[in-house]
Structure formats: structure tokens, C-alpha cells
Regions:
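Extreme N-terminal tail/first-helix region
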Residues: 1-15, 131-138
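Feature captures the catalytic cores and cofactor-binding loops of soluble hydro-lyases/lyases
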Residues: 3-10, 17-125
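Conserved N-terminal beta-strand and adjoining loop/helix that marks the start
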Residues: 130-148, 167
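Active-site-adjacent beta-strand/loop module that shapes the phosphate/pyrophosphate-binding cleft
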Residues: 143-145, 201-225, 235
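Conserved Nudix-box catalytic region and its N-terminal flanking loop in Nudix hydrolases
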Residues: 146-186, 190
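A short coil-to-beta-strand element that immediately follows conserved catalytic motifs
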Residues: 190-200
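NUDIX/MutT-family hydrolases
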Residues: 217, 226-258
Length: 267
């Protein structure tokens, strides 16, 4: 799998991913003398930054963080590369001073700690040679402000028993909108669904597979659904109720992307 990213600090590097799911401060969050992660909230406390491709949403804290990054690199304890969802000045300055390749606009959902990866900041690319990607559509149908979610059957190939939107694989060069319409018809029996919006893709990992999820929002005139073999149960919910369900990874992110997506106009 490969990701298109934006260069912040130039260079190329390889390493094993170390992924923190929360904003990170190098000041207080790491030991400047050992490179050990100290921040409990990071989820990777006790790991060492040295020679790792360190990924996190964005930086926080003091401007001293720039010099902390530089100091780690001078001691040979710094990360081989830095990957972020959104770059900030503190980390960017530190990466430039330290000569560490840095990129942003990275969907961290594509990465797991332990992934082998290479970063080509100059080419705007991150490669994950051990990860396969699958393109899927996930559709949310809406009626009077509530969204349909379904519980996946034990007969499907992934995420059995989890709650999801209406989903299906894209094959070859199939048009995502066409597949979305087919999935709604096949999995709900609703024929008059009206396409409203298409969201920004969201990446969700399941071990060695990364699912590139393309979100869609349809409006429907009924809450009466006829499930096929892929799903065994359905609910109409508000988005703020999603935490009560054992859902597939990043379902709320996919739902929000669909709701905030670009409007699809007829013709």
C-alpha cells in the first residue's frame, strides 16, 4: 500500500512505525537522554523513538520541543521519520534542524505500530510493503435525521458481528457511486434512495489489510428495510449514539465524513 502525503522536511527514510493516537509533546512526553516515550496517553509509553518512524496527529506544548527533537537526533536517539495528520511549527522546525524527513496529511488509520514503512518526503509518498489495500464503499441511509446501521452476519469475510453502514467492495474500475446505489438496493431493499453527498475517504486497518472506505449519504422515505444475508440486525440512530454499539473500526469517522461530504447534484 502507498499513501500520498505532503513534504514538510526533506529526505527519505525507512523504519518501523511507532503510532501515537493523541497529540504529542516532545517536552515531557519523551526522555531527552534515552528517547523513551514517557507520555501515558500516547499508548506507546516505554517504546524508544530511536530509528522509528514516529506518527502522531499533531504536536502540542512548548517551543522548546523543536530543540528537544534536535537534541534527540544529535544523540542518535531521534526518530528516522516523522508522520503527522497536521504539521505544526514546533515539530516542523525540530525536524528541519535535526535533518529528519517529515510529512503530513497522513491518515493515521492506515498505520499500526510495528508496520514496516518507507518515507519519501521529497516524492510525497509513504510505502507500506506488507499492507494490502482494499477499496470499499460505506453508505449511510438517512430518514428524518436518523441513520441506518446494520450488524454484520457471521457469513461475511470481515468484522463479523460488528455494526457498520451498508458496505461493499469495489471491483476493478467500478464507479463508487454505482456500487453505493447497488449496495443500498441489495442490502436494504429500498429502491427510491436519493444520493445526497460523498465524503472524503477514510482508511481503516484490520491486521495486514487497509480498507480505503469511500463514504456516501443517501436520503430515503421509509425506515422499513429488508436485510439480505450479509446483515442480521438494523437500527436507526443519531450520530451521538454510535458509542453504544460494538462497531467496525472508525465507523464514526466514516459517518461524519459522509455527513460533511460534498453535495452530489443530479445530472
Amino acid at each position: 500500500m502507498n499513501l500520498s502525503v505532503r513534504r514538510i522536511a526533506p529526505g527519505r527514510a525507512e523504519g518501523v512505525a511507532l503510532v501515537a493516537r493523541v497529540p504529542f509533546s516532545f517536552v515531557g512526553g519523551s526522555d531527552p537522554m534515552t528517547g523513551e516515550v514517557l507520555d501515558e496517553a500516547s499508548g506507546v509509553r516505554g517504546e524508544r523513538l530511536g530509528r522509528r518512524a514516529f506518527a502522531f496527529p499533531h504536536g502540542k506544548g512548548s517551543t522548546v520541543g523543536s530543540y528537544t527533537i534536535y537534541g534527540l537526533a544529535k544523540r542518535g536517539l531521534g526518530p528516522s521519520a516523522i508522520l503527522m495528520e497536521r504539521a505544526d511549527g514546533i515539530v516542523a522546525v525540530g525536524a528541519v534542524l535535526a535533518g529528519i524527513p517529515m510529512v503530513d496529511r497522513v491518515d493515521l488509520g492506515a498505520l499500526l505500530t510495528g508496520d514496516r514503512l518507507s518515507v519519501d518526503a521529497d516524492g510525497g509518498r509513504v510505502d507500506l510493503p506488507d499492507v494490502d489495500s482494499r477499496d470499499v464503499v460505506t453508505v449511510f441511509v438517512r430518514n428524518r435525521g436518523r441513520l441506518l446501521i446494520v450488524r454484520r452476519s457471521e457469513a461475511v469475510g470481515s468484522f463479523q458481528g460488528k455494526w457498520s453502514g451498508i458496505s461493499g467492495y469495489l471491483e476493478g474500475r467500478e464507479d463508487p457511486e454505482d456500487r453505493a446505489r447497488k449496495e443500498v438496493s441489495e442490502e436494504t431493499g429500498i429502491r427510491d434512495a436519493r444520493l445526497v453527498a460523498a465524503g472524503v475517504p477514510v482508511i481503516s486497518r484490520d491486521r495486514g489489510t487497509a480498507y480505503v472506505v469511500r463514504p456516501f449519504l443517501f436520503d430515503v422515505s421509509t425506515r422499513r428495510v429488508r436485510l439480505d444475508w450479509e446483515n442480521v440486525e438494523s437500527r436507526w440512530i443519531r450520530i451521538d449514539e454510535i458509542d453504544a454499539f460494538d462497531a467496525v473500526p472508525r465507523l464514526e469517522d466514516v459517518m461524519r465524513s459522509a455527513l460533511a461530504g460534498r453535495e452530489v447534484r443530479k445530472g
